[in-house]
Regions:
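N-terminal Rossmann-like NAD(P)+-binding subdomain of aldehyde/semialdehyde dehydrogenases
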Residues: 1-127, 289
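Conserved C-terminal structural/oligomerization subdomain of aldehyde/semialdehyde dehydrogenase
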Residues: 22-34, 53-70, 254-258, 272-273, ...
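Generic non-transmembrane alpha-helical segments
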Residues: 61-72, 175, 179-184, 249-250, ...
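Rossmann-like NAD(P) dinucleotide-binding subdomain of oxidoreductase/dehydrogenase enzymes
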Residues: 113-254, 417, 428, 432, ...
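ALDH superfamily catalytic-core signature
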Residues: 182, 209, 219-350, 355-356
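A generic structural motif
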Residues: 191-194, 231-232, 293-304, 397-398, ...
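Short, well-ordered alpha-helix to beta-strand connector turns
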Residues: 206-207, 225-226, 267, 390-391, ...
Length: 448
């Protein structure tokens, strides 16, 4: 069985406080050592005293760490073994972890350019773009391994970073921290602090600034705290205001289901000026054909959870329905049901297509960790209103004025005009704004 250590000052440490990490099939995979709140606070204090490092040295270490993450054996774990374990504990198809290896390698090599583009054009002569603090805390998620690429930007900008890993995936940040240390990053600049909720709160309290991923309840609890950047549900949407052909359907299917539908940028609502029922039926037929397979199967495209948890997620969908019709259910009647047991007590979450008859149905704000999309009618007279509150909004339309309205709406964080394939892979594209906007500030400078 694996061991997930507390990692401080470049040393992997055990703890008296531990818990077992199980795979989605219920089999124990690792012992996770926990850093209690007091240790978390002490670690942050020690990190403040870590020696400064030059930016070019940090960027070189980051680039090398990306290569090591993708190619090296770290802590006795090969890249392929990492992918196998990551998929088993997170429930995300193994292909996602395999893609993340290459993505992390490529993105780490671009970090210098990525953070440079985030600085204001005026920074330089009469202004300086400087850090708001020195230690950055990260309360990480478990939905997708590539989310850890975000906090690497903080290292590039000169922050020491302490990561509290997500409960279902501590293996990705552990591999990344090991890669950073092997690449030569100063040991006091990076820590891995698995721990309970109290330790996460202690990290947010002790760090200068923090990035927290969480639910709507987490967003509400931390709203107004200018030291914490919260990334909650994405509620990403697509407007179809063009004739629907195979190319449009292909794009919709990819946006809904890519990476198992677990990303916050996966589409959860589709609005159309055309026949919404016909569009929903077409999506249901395509999505229902996606196979339920064990996550370690190379053909797997759907997430897997423990059976009871998967059933609970489907129950949550039914509670949100409020008259919406699930057009995929009939496809599953003779095919294992919408929650399909694939391995021991592990069950694949089959897609759902919910058809509603109005653009303000409350279910349209529902976001679940599998391919689940709500399809609704939309008319031009409704404007941006139903499309607002979106991490990403794709507009399949020739209406240039509507695109301008979307760009001006503060609740829409990314606007995509037309079928932009795999747009979420662009490391230069802001994700809910630039992280640098939160970590840095402009200060005036004048000298004789």
């Amino acid at each position: 069985m694996l061991s997930i250590p507390v990692l401080r000052d470049g040393e992997e440490r055990s703890s008296r406080d531990t818990h077992l990490l199980h795979g989605v099939d219920g089999v124990p995979v690792a012992t996770v050592h926990e850093a209690p709140a007091m240790v978390t606070r002490l670690t942050v204090k020690r990190m403040r005293a870590a020696p400064r490092t030059a930016q070019d040295k940090r960027l070189a270490a980051l680039a090398d760490a990306g290569r090591l993450f993708a190619e090296a054996t770290l802590g006795g774990q090969t890249p392929e073994e990492y992918c196998r374990v990551q998929s088993i504990v997170s429930g995300v198809p193994i292909g996602v972890a395999r893609q993340t290896l290459g993505r992390m390698r490529d993105d780490c090599g671009l970090l210098g350019d990525v953070v440079a583009r985030q600085s204001p054009v005026g920074a330089g002569r009469t202004a300086r773009w400087v850090r708001r603090g020195s230690v950055f805390g990260v309360v990480a998620p478990s939905n997708h391994p590539a989310t850890h690429g975000a906090w690497l930007q903080a290292v590039a900008l000169g922050y020491r970073v302490a990561v509290r890993p997500g409960a279902r995936d501590p293996v990705t940040p552990l591999r990344l921290v090991r890669a950073l240390l092997q690449a030569g990053l100063e040991p006091g600049w990076i820590s891995l602090l698995p721990g309970p909720h109290a330790a996460a709160d202690a990290l947010m309290d002790a760090a200068d600034l923090s990035l927290v991923y969480g639910s709507e309840a987490t967003v509400a609890r931390l709203r107004g705290n200018d030291r914490v950047l919260v990334r909650g549900p994405g509620r990403s949407k697509i407007l179809v205001d063009v004739p629907v052909d195979e190319a449009v359907l292909d794009h919709l299917i990819a946006e809904i289901s890519a990476d198992g539908g677990v990303r916050c940028t996966n589409t959860t609502a589709v609005f159309t000026s055309g026949d919404h029922r016909a569009l929903a039926e077409a999506l249901a037929g395509r999505l229902a054909a996606l196979p339920g397979l064990p996550v370690t199967d190379a053909r797997a495209v759907l997430p897997v959870r423990p059976r009871k948890e998967a059933e609970g997620l489907r129950a949550a969908l039914h509670r949100a329905a409020q008259g919406a019709v699930d057009l995929t259910e009939r496809y599953y009647e003779a095919d294992g049901g919408p929650v399909t047991v694939v391995d021991e007590d592990a069950a694949a979450l089959r897609p759902a297509v919910m058809c509603v008859d109005r653009s303000d149905h409350p279910g349209l704000g529902t976001e679940l960790p599998f391919p689940c999309v709500w399809v609704a009618p939309w008319g031009r007279q409704e404007g941006i209103g139903p499309l607002d509150d979106s991490l990403a909004l794709t507009l399949l339309t020739d209406d240039a004025a509507l695109v301008d309205e979307a760009l001006e709406a503060p609740g829409i964080r990314t606007v995509l005009h037309g079928r932009v394939p795999r747009w979420w892979r662009d490391p230069h594209l802001p994700h809910d704004g630039y992280l640098g906007q939160f970590l840095m500030e402009a200060r005036g400078f004048a000298g004789s």
